[in-house]
């Protein structure tokens, strides 16, 4: 595992999240905070199916990690009052693996496949027939004497989750009757999520402290809940157990999470780009060497948020720091900076140091 995966602002699921994250999951569409369009559309799909007494269309949920795709799959099963079977794309290496799982489904069950874009091709091709006709063809024997035996399966609803919808094949994507894209959350939505989580965990937190955590959570509930637990630890050990604004800020400083939600590696990349390469352009490989990381780590882990936050711009010649990046590091951007007009939502001005005096 990459060291950056253990960062408190990593959107990936960590072992430390464990059972605590499960206890914080919403149990119904009404409990689910955020994603209003997806919730409204899903409610219509599910309630329409219940009124008809049929199984709903297959559902594909896409979006970055940590936004609630697994929680939504659990809610779908709960709303339908049926069992949820959970697996993942990498676990389905052979068609037989999928056939065994499908044959054990009861009518109306929900089958959730996480990372469905990573499913093996033989299993994917078997899934086509299962999704359309609720049937699988099991091949018995090998060579010229092999025969295909059709096997009926109970009508079910497939819920697929993916962080890379573009990696899905066309035939698989087309078989989903409903596709919902999960967007990053607004600070106000994260604030409500944190207040709900604090109540469940028994954390005494002031509203402005919760707002501070929400503002550093990269628009991701998983990160917000993880930071809440880390701040709670700090408050219990070094304060009186109450999370106030000063306590929250001090705790987040200890865990190297700055005002924009950048961690140590993010800031190292930004600092190398601005101070080491005068704002760029510079290639990812060169930037990775400068911070002592693999190029894939910089490109896949750090860069997406830096670009989304308006701190880094991708150009044909390489990565370029925006005016917001210079200002976030407390520096004055050069006057001829091409990307100086890019704004960062929620960015506050800081004292700056002019390197060009």
From Swiss-Prot:
Its EC number is 3.6.4.-. It catalyses: ATP + H2O = ADP + phosphate + H(+). Mg(2+) binds at residue 70. It is found in: Cytoplasm. InterPro entries: AAA+_ATPase, AAA_lid_4, DNA_helicase_Holl-junc_RuvB, P-loop_NTPase, RuvB-like_N, RuvB_C, WH-like_DNA-bd_sf, WH_DNA-bd_sf. SUPFAM superfamilies: P-loop containing nucleoside triphosphate hydrolases, Winged helix' DNA-binding domain. One of its GO terms (biological process) is DNA repair. One of its GO terms (molecular function) is four-way junction helicase activity. Residues 259-357 are annotated as: Head domain (RuvB-H). Pfam families: AAA_lid_4 (PF17864), RuvB_C (PF05491), RuvB_N (PF05496). CDD domains: AAA. It comes from the Bacteria. Keywords: ATP-binding, Cytoplasm, DNA damage, DNA recombination, DNA repair, DNA-binding, Hydrolase, Nucleotide-binding. Its main location: cytoplasm. Homohexamer. Forms an RuvA(8)-RuvB(12)-Holliday junction (HJ) complex. HJ DNA is sandwiched between 2 RuvA tetramers; dsDNA enters through RuvA and exits via RuvB. An RuvB hexamer assembles on each DNA strand where it exits the tetramer. Each RuvB hexamer is contacted by two RuvA subunits (via domain III) on 2 adjacent RuvB subunits; this complex drives branch migration. In the full resolvosome a probable DNA-RuvA(4)-RuvB(12)-RuvC(2) complex forms which resolves the HJ. This is Holliday junction branch migration complex subunit RuvB.
């Amino acid at each position: 595992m990459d060291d950056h995966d253990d960062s408190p602002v990593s959107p990936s699921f960590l072992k430390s999240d464990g059972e605590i994250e499960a206890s914080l999951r919403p149990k119904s569409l009404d409990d689910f905070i955020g994603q209003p369009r997806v919730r409204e559309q899903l409610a219509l799909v599910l309630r329409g199916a219940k009124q008809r007494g049929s199984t709903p269309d297959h559902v594909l949920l896409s979006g970055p990690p940590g936004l609630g795709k697994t929680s939504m799959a659990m809610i779908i099963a709960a709303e339908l009052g049926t069992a949820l079977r959970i697996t993942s794309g990498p676990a389905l290496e052979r068609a037989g693996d999928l056939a065994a799982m499908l044959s054990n489904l009861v009518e109306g069950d929900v089958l959730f496949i996480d990372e469905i874009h990573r499913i093996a091709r033989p299993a994917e091709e078997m899934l086509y027939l299962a999704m359309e006709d609720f049937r699988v063809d099991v091949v018995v024997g090998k060579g010229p004497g092999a025969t295909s035996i059709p096997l009926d399966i109970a009508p079910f609803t497939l819920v697929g989750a993916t962080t890379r919808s573009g990696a899905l094949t066309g035939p698989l994507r087309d078989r989903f009757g409903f596709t919902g894209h999960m967007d990053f959350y607004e600070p106000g939505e994260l604030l409500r999520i944190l207040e709900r989580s604090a109540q469940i965990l028994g954390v005494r937190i002031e509203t402005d402290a919760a707002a501070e955590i929400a503002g550093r959570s990269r628009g991701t509930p998983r990160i917000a809940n993880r930071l809440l637990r880390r701040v709670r630890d700090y408050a219990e050990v070094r304060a009186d157990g109450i999370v106030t604004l000063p306590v929250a800020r001090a705790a987040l400083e200890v865990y190297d999470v700055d005002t924009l939600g950048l961690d140590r590696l993010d800031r190292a990349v930004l600092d190398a780009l601005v101070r080491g390469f005068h704002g760029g352009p510079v290639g990812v490989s060169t930037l990775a060497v400068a911070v002592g990381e693999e190029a894939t780590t910089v490109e896949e882990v750090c860069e997406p948020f830096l670009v989304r936050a308006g701190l880094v711009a991708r150009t044909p010649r390489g990565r370029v720091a925006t005016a917001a990046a210079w200002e976030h590091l407390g520096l004055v951007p050069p006057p001829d900076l091409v990307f100086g007009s890019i704004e960062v939502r929620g960015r506050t001005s800081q004292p700056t140091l002019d390197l060009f005096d």
